[in-house]
Swiss-Prot record:
Protein name per Swiss-Prot or TrEMBL: Protein ENHANCED DISEASE RESISTANCE 2-like
Subcellular location: Endoplasmic reticulum membrane; Cell membrane; Endosome membrane
CDD domains in UniProt: PH, START
InterPro entries in UniProt: EDR2-like, EDR2_C, PH-like_dom_sf, PH_domain, START-like_dom_sf, START_lipid-bd_dom
Alphabetized Pfam families for the sequence: EDR2_C (PF07059), PH (PF00169), START (PF01852)
Function: Binds to phosphatidylinositol-4-phosphate (PtdIns(4)P). May regulate the salicylic acid- (SA-) mediated resistance to pathogens.
Native organism: Arabidopsis thaliana (Mouse-ear cress)
This protein's encoding gene: EDR2L
Length: 719
C-alpha cells in the first residue's frame, strides 16, 4: 500500500504534435516516490496515464501564466535533470492550488536528497589535454549535493533557487528595483537600512501613504525624466488578491487606478513576461497638454517568502507604434512589490510598494515641474486605491482566479477536489511505469504528452565588537608576499576610487561570512583577509562561449605555475549575440592539506556545487540596478551550471550564466548599463560544520565602470 502525499484535480496542459495546445482536467496523485495522473479518480489497481519517479534529481519549473481557450492557468513542469525530455506538465486555475502542489512536490524531492550519496568516483573532474574540444567537455555539474540542506536560512530564502526554476528572468531591459526592499523587509542588516535611508527621503504623507523620492542624481537620463518615486502603504488583503488586481486590465481596474484609461496585451513573451499597451488618464489641463500612453514590458515573479514582484519598463514594439493624439511617454522603470505582513485581528495584511520613474515627454514635461509632480502622485495613488477597494469589497473567500489580459473568462471549469484517501496499489514503481507507457497509447490519445515550447533573510543576531575582533583574529594568516608585478591581464588595475574601466581588490570586511559559532547563533562576521591574492583580470569577447581560458598562452595562471604557485581561475561567462567572459585569477603559494579549500579544489563536482558561494555588491550606479543584483549570498553551483577543470597547478571554474534564465536576465540588464556601475564580487567555499568554520573568502574584486568595447578576442588555440 502506497501512502498518498497529496492528490486532487489539476489541469493537464501541453501541445499536440500538430502544434495546437490543449488543457484537460486530470486527477493527480503524489506518492513518496511517484507522481502520476489519471483521467478519473483511481480505483483499485487502475493504471495511470503517465508516471514520473521522484528522486533528488527532480526539479519543479515554474512556467508562469499561460492563456488557453479563454482560461488563464499557472503552469508547473516537473522533470528529472538526468532525463529532461521526460516530464509532466500540470497547471491550476488559481495560484494557491499551484503553489500547494509545488510545495508538496518539493518536499518529496527534499526527502530524497539524502539518497544522493557523494562519490568521488561517480563525478570525476578531468585534466584538460591539448587537442580536446573547446566546448563543454569537463565533468558534469548537473548534480545536487546533500550539503545544500545546511544553507543559511536567510540565504535560502532569497537565493537563486537551487531546486526550483521561477521561469525566465527579467528581460534584458527591465530593472529590478525590489532587492533593497527585500532587505528592508527582512531587516537583513543595519547597514542595509542605513543604505536605504541614504538614498531616499520622505517627501510627504498622502491618503495614508508614505511618498518617497530618490536622492540619487543620475547623469544618463534626460532632464524631463523624473527621479524615482515610490508610494508605500498597507492593504488588508492577501498577496494573491492584490497580485490579481495589479495584473488585470479589465473593468475592475477603473475602481482602484485613477490614472488608467485603457490597456491591451501586445505580445505574450512567456509565462512571466508580456508586452502591454497602456493609456494614461492624467487629467492635467487636457485642452493644452496631450494625453500620454505607454508601451512597456511587464515581468513578474513570486518569491519564496510569498511576496510578488511586478516590474515595468518601456519597450518599442512593431505592433505598438505611436498613436495619433497621444505622446508616447517613456517608463524608465517601475512596478509593484507586494509583500506579506503579520495578520492583525485575524485579517491578512500586505505591504504594497509602487515605484515609478518616468519621462512624460512632450514640451511641458521638462519645464513644468507641477505637471510632472501631479502625474506621478496620481499614478502612485493607485496604492491607496487598492487599499480602499479591498476595504469596501465583500465575498473574497473564493479562490483567486488568475486574471486574463484579453477577454476575461466569465466562466471556468469546475475544479473538483476529491476527498482525502489513500490510493491502494500493489504494483511496483517499475511495473507502474512500464504499464503506464502502454496505457498512454490507448487511454490518452487526445492528450498528447509532448513537451510544449515557450520562449526562452532572517535578522542577524547582535554581535559585540569584541566578538567580531576575536573571530577575525582567528581567521587571519600571515601575508603571502607574492610579487604581483609579473602578472597582467587586459583589464587595467587601478586603486583610484574614481577610476574607470578597471579593477581593484575589495576589502574583505565589506562582506559578512559565517563566524566560528555560526552553527549555534547564526552569527556572521566581517570576512577579513582573503585566502588568495587576485593578481589579474581579463575581459574577453567572442562569437562563442569561451571555455577553459587557462589554456591561453601567457595567461596569469600559466605565469603562476612557472613560479610554483597555485591558481584558482573564475571565468564568468555572459551569453548574448556577443559572448563575454570576465576572468579572475586568484593565486596562492600552496594548498593547506586537509583544509576546506583543499577539499573543494580536489573534491568532485557534486561537492563543489554544494559549496561554491558568491556574495555580490553594487556600491555605485543606478539605484534601480543595484536592487536587481542585491547582496544576498548565492550558491553558484545550485543556481547556474559550473564547469570545473582541475589542472596540476590550477582549478578553473567556468560559470555559465546563460544556464539560468533567472541569472541570465539579471546579468543581462546589468550589461546594458555596465559603464555606470561599480560591482563587487566575493568568492568563497561555504562552511557547514563547526570544524570548517569560520568561512574565508577565496578572494574579492571590485570592477568599476567597465567598457564593453575594451574586451578583446582571446587566442584559445590548444597548442
Amino acid at each position: 500500500m502506497s501512502k498518498v502525499v497529496y492528490e486532487g484535480w489539476m489541469v493537464r496542459y501541453g501541445r499536440r504534435k500538430i502544434g495546437r495546445s490543449y488543457i484537460h482536467m486530470r486527477y493527480f496523485v503524489l506518492e513518496p516516490r511517484l507522481l502520476a495522473y489519471y483521467k478519473k479518480k483511481p480505483q483499485d489497481n487502475q493504471l495511470p496515464i503517465k508516471t514520473m519517479v521522484i528522486d533528488g534529481n527532480c526539479r519543479v519549473e515554474d512556467r508562469g501564466l499561460k492563456t488557453h481557450h479563454g482560461h488563464m492557468v499557472y503552469v508547473l513542469s516537473i522533470y528529472n535533470k538526468k532525463e529532461k525530455h521526460h516530464r509532466i506538465t500540470m497547471a491550476a486555475f488559481n495560484i494557491q492550488e499551484a503553489l500547494m502542489w509545488k510545495e508538496k512536490i518539493e518536499c518529496v524531492i527534499d526527502q530524497h536528497q539524502d539518497s544522493l550519496v557523494p562519490s568521488g568516483q561517480q563525478y570525476v573532474s578531468f585534466e584538460y589535454k591539448p587537442g580536446m574540444d573547446a566546448g563543454r567537455t569537463a565533468s558534469s555539474s548537473d548534480h545536487e549535493s546533500p550539503f545544500s540542506a545546511l544553507e543559511d536560512e536567510n540565504d535560502s530564502q532569497r537565493d537563486l533557487l537551487r531546486r526550483t526554476t521561477i521561469g525566465n528572468g527579467p528581460p534584458e531591459s527591465i530593472l529590478d528595483w525590489t532587492k533593497e526592499f527585500d532587505a528592508e523587509l527582512s531587516n537583513q542588516s543595519s547597514s542595509n537600512q542605513a543604505f536605504s535611508r541614504k538614498h531616499w527621503r520622505l517627501l510627504q504623507c498622502q491618503n495614508g501613504l508614505r511618498i518617497f523620492e530618490e536622492l540619487l542624481e543620475v547623469d544618463y537620463l534626460p532632464r524631463s525624466c523624473s527621479r524615482a518615486m515610490k508610494a508605500v502603504g498597507v492593504v488588508e488583503a492577501t498577496c494573491e488578491e492584490i497580485f490579481e488586481l495589479v495584473m488585470s486590465m479589465d473593468g475592475t481596474r477603473y475602481e482602484w487606478d485613477c490614472s488608467f484609461h485603457n490597456g491591451r496585451l501586445v505580445e505574450e513573451v512567456d509565462g512571466h513576461t508580456a508586452i502591454l499597451y497602456h493609456r494614461l488618464l492624467l487629467d492635467w489641463f487636457p485642452m493644452v497638454v496631450w494625453p500620454r500612453d505607454l508601451c512597456y514590458v511587464r515581468y513578474w515573479r513570486r518569491n519564496d517568502d510569498g511576496s510578488y514582484v511586478v516590474l515595468f519598463r518601456s519597450r518599442e514594439h512593431e505592433n505598438c507604434g505611436p498613436q495619433p493624439g497621444f505622446v508616447r511617454a517613456h517608463l524608465e522603470s517601475g512596478g509593484f512589490n507586494i509583500a506579506p505582513l503579520k495578520p492583525r485581528n485575524g485579517r491578512p495584511r500586505t505591504q504594497v510598494q509602487h515605484l515609478i520613474q518616468i519621462d512624460l515627454k512632450g514640451w511641458g514635461s521638462g519645464y513644468l515641474p507641477a505637471f510632472q509632480q501631479h502625474c506621478l502622485l496620481q499614478m502612485l495613488n493607485s496604492v491607496s486605491g487598492l487599499r480602499e477597494w479591498f476595504s469596501q469589497t465583500d465575498d473574497r473567500g473564493q479562490p483567486i482566479r488568475i486574471p486574463v489580459m484579453v477577454n476575461m473568462a466569465s466562466s471556468s471549469l469546475a475544479l473538483g477536489k476529491g476527498g482525502k484517501h489513500h490510493h491502494k496499489s500493489s504494483l511496483s514503481i517499475d511495473q507502474t511505469n512500464g504499464a503506464s507507457r502502454n496505457s498512454v497509447l490507448m487511454d490518452e490519445d487526445s492528450d498528447d504528452d509532448d513537451e510544449f515550447q515557450i520562449p526562452d533573510s532572517e535578522p542577524e543576531p547582535e554581535t559585540s565588537k569584541q566578538d567580531q575582533e576575536t573571530d577575525a583574529k582567528k581567521t587571519e594568516e600571515p601575508a603571502l608576499n607574492i610579487d604581483l608585478s609579473c602578472f597582467s591581464g587586459n583589464l587595467r588595475h587601478d586603486d583610484n576610487e574614481n577610476a574607470r574601466n578597471c579593477w581593484r581588490i575589495s576589502d574583505g570586511n565589506n562582506f559578512k561570512v559565517r563566524g566560528k559559532s555560526f552553527c549555534d547563533d547564526k552569527r556572521k562576521i566581517p570576512a577579513g583577509k582573503h585566502l588568495m591574492d587576485l593578481v589579474a583580470v581579463d575581459w574577453f569577447k567572442d562569437t562563442k562561449r569561451m571555455d577553459h581560458v587557462v589554456r591561453r598562452k601567457g595567461c596569469a595562471a600559466q605565469v603562476a605555475a612557472e613560479k610554483g604557485l597555485f591558481s584558482t581561475v573564475v571565468n564568468v561567462q555572459v551569453p548574448g549575440s556577443t559572448h563575454y567572459s570576465m576572468v579572475f585569477y586568484f593565486v596562492t603559494k600552496e594548498l593547506v592539506p586537509g583544509s576546506l579549500f583543499q577539499r573543494f579544489v580536489d573534491g568532485d563536482d557534486e561537492f563543489r556545487n554544494s559549496r561554491l558561494k558568491l556574495i555580490p555588491l553594487v556600491p555605485k550606479g543606478s539605484w534601480i540596478v543595484r536592487q536587481s543584483v542585491g547582496s544576498t549570498p548565492c550558491l553558484l553551483g545550485k543556481a547556474v551550471d559550473c564547469n570545473y577543470i582541475r589542472g596540476p597547478t590550477y582549478l578553473e571554474i567556468d560559470v555559465d550564466i546563460g544556464s539560468s534564465t533567472v541569472a541570465n536576465g539579471v546579468l543581462g540588464l546589468v550589461i546594458g548599463v555596465i559603464t555606470s556601475l561599480v560591482v563587487e564580487m566575493a568568492f568563497l567555499v561555504q562552511a557547514n560544520t563547526p570544524e570548517e568554520l569560520p568561512e574565508r573568502l577565496i578572494g574579492a574584486v571590485r570592477v568599476s565602470h567597465v567598457e564593453l568595447s575594451s574586451a578583446i578576442v582571446p587566442n584559445l588555440d590548444s597548442d
